[in-house]
Amino acid sequence: MATPNPATGLGAIATGQLSVVGHALPWAIAVAFFFLAGGYLSFGTQVLIWILFALSLDLALGYAGIVTLGQAAFFGFGAYAAGLFAIHVSSDPILGHLIAVAVTALFGLVTGALILHTTGVTFLMLTLAIVSVMFEYANQATKLTGGDDGLQGVNIAPLFGLFEFTMFGQTAYLYALVVLFIWFVIAWRVVSSPFGRSLDGIRQNPRRMRAIGTPVWWRLLAIYTLSAAMAGSAGALSTHATRFVGLSVLSLFTSGIVAVILILGGIRRLYGAFVGATIYLLVQDWSAKVSPYFWEFIVGLMLIATVLFLEGGLMDLGRVMRSVLGRIRKADSK
Amino acid sequence: MRKLLSGICALGVVAMTGSASAETFKIGLIASYTGAFATWGTQFQNAIEAFQSIHGKSVKGPKGEIIDVQLVYRDAGSAGPDKAKQLAEELVLREKVSMLGGFELSPHAMSVADISKQAKVPIVVMNAATASITRGSPYYVRTSLTIPQWGQAIGKWAAENGIKKVYTITSDYAPGHDAEAYFHKSFKAAGGEIVGADRTALRETNFAVYMEKALQAKPDAVYMFQPGGSPSISFVKAFSERGLKQAGIKLLGNGEFAELYLPHFSDDVIGTISVNHYTETNTRPENKIMRDQLIKQFGEKGVTDIASVGAWDAMALIYIALREHGASADGLKYIDAMKGKTLASPRGPIMIDPEERDIIQNIYIRRIEKVGGKLQNVDIATIPMVKDPWKIDNPVKR
Amino acid sequence: MLSFALTVLLDGISYGMVLFIISVGLTVTMGLMRVINLAHGSFAMIGGYVAGYLTQHGVDFFLALLLATVAAGLLGALCEVTVIRPLYRKGELAQVLLTIGIVFVVTALITEIFGAFPYRVEFPVYLTQPLDIGFRTYPAYRLFLILVGGIIALILWLLIEGSLYGAKLRAAVDNPRMARAVGMNVSLLFTATFIVGTALAGLGGAIGAGILSLEPSYALKYVVLFLVVVIVGGEGSFKGSFVAAMALGIIDTTGKYFVAAAAPYLLYAAVFALLLWRPQGILPPKSLA
């Protein structure tokens, strides 16, 4: 890569084009939401959790080009780890969160080491197999996971001994926001580092990267593990915020939806996760009132349109509109 | 000029009702309208609307005030309990409901226990039947049934009526476990032998394997427990497809054979014995009122089932509680109002257990017969005023 | 004991036949066009729903099957021309996501039209009864599946090994560049094959409705099974998909009989182990082996 292309998210950050205002805006909105949300606060927490989840996928899928449909395995692993820790060991949220992230990272490391040498459809199938194994196992291990009934009795102690997790959701929201911010900074640092740039190269042409001596497999393993840790963190957040873990955290559907969210928002943008998660959850919430399955139809169409016409996702909408308008103007002037 | 007149009239109406000013009492109803358990939402809603057509959409409170009883319906989509919990939070925080109701699935009912405690909101369970639900929070009251009431009744009846060996195939979730446990207990206590027991996945629709295993064990009867709807229909189809009926094995069931589902079965089910707390075709006057109203309002779709009677009686109890305490009382006061109350329900006499806040009612054993060209459940035995056996076996530790 | 073992085997084979009929189209198109098509289950689902609708309204069973097959094939043609063709050149990710989008759209439409309750195909009475096969009775339906599956497998095998179309197909799978170089109309081949594949899926969905029950979540629920057959068998390998389908059917059924609770996750664990051992599948076509 000679000069960073300002059009891509990576390039934009690299060339400093995303101004301070641009960066501050999403966080300002998130903080403002806390004060204005009223009864919608727990909805906001859900959005934050899905943003983190999608962000984790952006690292693996968007930047490193690891086409996985198994991200829910890490989300679910982190969620159950946090829940089981709270029930059997300690209900302290910070400790539980750290443990959940650690064990999920380990899980990511092990599975990544096993499967990252494969590519294409075989790799995809392996990721699907992992999620399926975990889902089916959790489904029948009812003594451990509660099965279909879900993990009951998850009590989370107040954060720092002071801030209780109630159904009104204030603690959960701020907690999720802080966790998301920390991970975002980590992700940003990673993708703008030389390591991150090498991932870009690996995604585009792994053979060439190997030829110049890059340890491709190790780099992929590293980013896969980081991505797993982030997804596990999102899962732990989910458990702490809702004080409940259901089988859906491990479902194939969840795995698919997070990929959908990322594509809709725009991959390799980091902020694409923000846009995608917000739009998706809003669409789902709004259209659920119209009809319970209408949102599936809308999301399906959006997905098809995005793949065919809007490769950079919704974040790219501005650029695409401008180029379309530009072409129209050129045709007019002829 | 006309506008001015109608404006004055409107003011006058408001002024007149002002002294008995309208308050609103909002109830959030969480049930499934889509997915595998899609019938429950509609059944609850139809029964509630029918009830309100007869008894009115408002109640008079203790001070004579008019209380508008409003229902807000949400679809749990036959999804996991986290969905039900999320909907409950939304209903309490956004819609500001003062009471939650519905819940056809036990995991859904159980998931809202801590919301009831934090928001101090009563939960009226209109179907979910796992015995331990009402212990989850002092805000639970149930108007439907507990599975042990069913399992115990049919286990005992089977052993006392010539069935010696039974193979049980029950669904792998809390109500299924209850059914299996209590059938086994009462069947064995009355001298019967359990020759095998299998648990099937909650949304299983392919029962070939289980039928085959049952056939190999050569029982006198198979006891099934499946959620009503597609799993039970597939189960019964597999039962005759795989030759169990031909082998002379009887089928014992529960709510799978409600009147609502009978049209989906072939004549193969004639002779099937089932246990239930509501026989739809009973001739009680209260039942006639409910059934007639439902047919009047919903035509063919007005078939009554245990969802209808659970919701109907729940509304009756809620109206009683509102009459006693008004629209803005503390949640526990409404629960207190319902404790110990007896009602002449369309199903028979019922009482809300004052200690457990759970239902005490008649349990009926029925056989499927062809009456007037249609498949129908016909009562062959009644066990009066059964208290939940699980509560008796597991008293609250003092 | 022997009769029990035979029953388990027959159950497994009949299940495998359904998986084969549905998945064979997918393995050929994935091997031929190198497109990951997660929407393949939707064609099976549509075939099933069409057959269900027709048989519930009194149409003759075999006519309904024919119409279901044709309907799925037509929809396949429509899809191929409009949304699948642009995918040939785009990467895996685009293919995965666009076909997921198709699944969502189809699922929502099916729910809207037919409702969320499982949908029944009305099989003729003689197929819903057990048949006396000598030493015991066995469901006629399952025997029917084995018969139909066997016939289709035979026809396809003769087609692929013995006909000109089959030869072209094998050539294009083994070496697409060479195939184009010798002047084969590869895009016509793609379209024709895609249509045959989706039509077969529609047939499989229709006759398999007694095992893979029809409901709106069909396409999402069973896509993993179809992908397992394709990938474990080896993309593009007809023989591989047959073997994989049989293996999947028998292992899954046997598992349910003996280790009922553990069966599902043991199955996926086995798939995982197998793919690590043989990433190209157990019987991959020549160019990939």
Residue spans for each PLM region:
Chain A
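Transmembrane alpha-helices and adjacent helix-loop boundaries
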Residues: M1-K334
